[in-house]
Structure formats: structure tokens, C-alpha cells
Amino acid sequence: IPYFTEHTSMEGLYFDSSITTPFHFISVSGLAKRPSNPVGGLSYINNQFDQGVEHLNHLGVDYFISYTEEIESKAMDSEKLILLFSSEPFSVFKVNSSKVELIYQDIKVFSKARTQDGILSSILRDTDINNFFDKAYESFDELDKKRVIEVSNGMNIVSSKKNDLQITDLNITNNKISFFTNSPGELHLIKVSYFPNWKITNGKGPFRTSPSFMSVIPDNK
């Protein structure tokens, strides 16, 4: 699909290295007729189609493709999916999602353990050390209500009170994300997997944000 559409897909050659992968499989479990559920230890949502669609929105997915009559029927009944076209046995739906949003939810600040403590925790199997993934996983079903955000140096992070975000000229590549916003100074969620090598120009962040994304505070438009 990426080859012919020039559009990325949720699964790819290196996607197992992404911190979004567990959340992808949880979402798929609600959308597929016979989900593979390959990652152990996760609470899957088998056959809970509406919840799966909600997760697509949270993950910033643009399109959903069905290829069985049963799943196509569920997709047609969903108010959050828009049929674009069908070409048997496939039907392509638009997902009502966005790549950049303001964070309006309650914020739960996560304080990262010291590097040496994290290493010792891994070696000794010490489960008392806080882990960002655990906190993000626990709140995956509550993304409309709260976000877990990792900050350092005691920085004060607050939710946005605005509801009229306008994003223009959004451009996402493998090594650069750029956009214009009408809400400088507000906390923006970027639905791209967090990685510590990302750096920001004209703003603060990026901050690791649940479930597995980044957030930034632009200094200007």
C-alpha cells in the first residue's frame, strides 16, 4: 500500500521498533475479524469495533481499509468513518482524525527515574521503578480525559483552554515536522512516535506524551 499510495501505513518494515506498536495491536484487535494479537501481556479489545475506531482517531490514522463483508458492514454503520470508495474486496474509509491537536485533557506529570536507577531496575527486575509505558498503557482507554507527560527540571505544564486550533502547512517527513499554528504558547500534541533525538526550533519540548507521542509548546506561529 505505501508503494502505490506514497502514504505510510501502520505496519511496516521497522514498525516493531516503534513505541506505538503495542497500541497499534490493541486497536487492530477491535477492528479485525480474527486479530493476531501477537504481543503478550496486553489487554486486547477483540470485536469491540467502535472502540477500535476511537483508537484510530487517537493514533492519528488517516484511513481504514476493510476486506470482509462483516467488517465492512460495521464500518458503514460507524459515524466516525466516511466511505471513500470500494474496489472488491476492499473498501476504503476516511478516519476523522488529525495529526496535531491541542491538549485539553488533565495532565499527569511523569517523573523519569534516574538512568542508573533504571538500569538497576532492568537488571534486578525491580517493578517498583516507575515506567512511562506502564502509565501510558494504563490510561490508553482514557485519552479523552487525561494525558501522561514526561517533563524534566520541574517544568510546569498546563492544559490548553482554547478550542479553535487552526493548523496550516503541516509537513511530516522522516526527519522534520513543521506547521503553522494560531495558538502559540499552547500545548500541542504531535501524533508521531516519540524519540529522544527529536529537537524543536522556536518552542519548548518535545515532551513524551501518552500513549506514545510528542507534545510541544510553540513560541510563535
Feature roles, as predicted:
Residues D144-K221:
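Active-site-proximal, structured, solvent-exposed surfaces of multi-pass membrane proteins
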Residues S97-Q105, H188, K221:
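Short, charged/polar, Gly/Pro-enriched secondary-structure boundary elements
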